[in-house]
Amino acid sequence: LVRCSFSNRSIESLIHMHYSFGIDFDPDYQRGSVWNDTDRAKLLDSIFAGRSIGKFVLRRVPYDESLTKNCLYEVVDGKQRLLTLTAFYENRFVYHGYTYNDLPQEDKNWLKSAMTSVLELPESTTEKEVLEVFIAINQNGKPVDDAIIEHAKELLQEEKKNG
């Protein structure tokens, strides 16, 4: 059993972890970058609406491994979201006509101060345990099927009509 630590962090703090300590986005078990600009915009829409963007799972990299990887963390869950946040922060994509630098200061402050949950796997976590966590996160549960999503969209349209 892996003893994990939970913390709530601001988006700014999460981005700071990447720039200050390094986060490996590409451990062997991770898929590549698969989100498009629509997916990225939906994430930022959620942040600006004050909705949860889910938790991030990071593994503290063992010291000897950190020397070769040149980073202190690896992303176990939340890669697409974290790539989106760093890409936007670096002005590498446009969100509703704005790069990060073009955002009004009030919106920058909102984005940076938005809170999210981070689960940190300790340095002592073995590769086997990391893989078990990754599989459990990505395999467990039952996704909502398309019919339920369509029904919710129909209900939303009806609500919009009724004002």
What kind of feature is each model-predicted range?
Residues 1-13, 19, 23-37, 41-163:
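Basic- and aromatic-enriched surface patches that contact anionic nucleotides/nucleic acids
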